[in-house]
Amino acid sequence: MKRLLFVIAILLIGKIHAQENVFLTNEYWKQKPSVAQVEQAINQGNSATAFNSRAFDATTLAILNGAPYETITYLIDLEGNGVDKLTHDKRTYLFWAAYQDNVPVMEYLLKKGAKVNITESHQLTPLLFAAVGGRSNNAIYELLLKHGANLKDTNADGANALLLLLPHLKDLKEADYFVKKGLKLTATDNKGNNAIYYAATTGNRPIIEALMKKKINVKNLNNKGESAIFGAARGAKRNYNKLDTFLYLEQLGLSLNQKNKDGLSPLFVLAEKNKDEKVINYFLEKGNDANQLDKEGNNPLMKSAISNNISVI
């Protein structure tokens, strides 16, 4: 019993220490601390190499919050960090620097031998991670390619950097760099999703319209028989589309009640993530069946109960 209490006490002390570590808070790094200030905090007992509960460390948070270059490079060089240290989702510092469009820090890491052809837990390389983050600065990609990255790399779904970047672009001209490098606007991923499907995930009308002018098929169906409506229904990682996006796609001739090869309508996808009641109601009005079942016997209500809010349920 005493041994158990001792172990619990040690764990609690460690947890309290982690909670008190100023380096593991975004607020500290938003103040843009200097090297001298970081050294002072270290001398006060804060660890510049420890992780928080999500495997973010001081260097990662410094990069994500735009800390000064000198501060970030100081942290990188501390014993216990280094260019190959794995952080959240098995990402090295090069991933975070590319994601934040921090070319100077990328250059520093690459000079220190940072690897460019590695993948994190979601099978993204630093180059693909920058694209997923919507980074259109060509200097990021030029630097990575110069150090051996492959622009033709794809994620686990077979999507290349161009497809991953398209949802975030404001002007299709921003894609010219990738097209000149050999990537094609006509590309599809392993699931058969085309460029317009990807643009639809963020409801990116300017890009959808520009792609249609390039003869990209707005009515393309993927391997599961799904149109861009399903892409819009799935949305982006942290965002969902509003009703105006679906009204726009409907005006382009896409059916809101189109079923995929499993017999499921877009409502089945919407119920899991989209929190806009107007969207849900509109799809119901368009004939989407609230009682449809997937192969596991789940219906839209069950899907919404797992991850959506009470108003949608």
Model feature map: region roles:
Residues 1-23:
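Bacterial Sec-dependent N-terminal signal peptides
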Residues 16-45:
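Sec-dependent signal peptide cleavage junction
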Residues 20-29, 50-63, 85-95, 119-131, ...:
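Ankyrin-repeat boundary/"N-cap" motif
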Residues 31-33, 61-68, 96-102, 129-137, ...:
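Ankyrin repeat A-helix N-terminal signature
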Residues 40-47, 73-81, 107-115, 142-150, ...:
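Ankyrin repeat domain, specifically the short helix-to-loop turn at the C-terminus of the second helix
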Residues 57-107:
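Mid-chain, structured segments of secreted extracytoplasmic proteins
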Residues 134-254:
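Solenoidal tandem-repeat scaffolds enriched in leucines and small polar residues
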Residues 221-313:
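Eukaryotic tandem repeat interaction scaffolds
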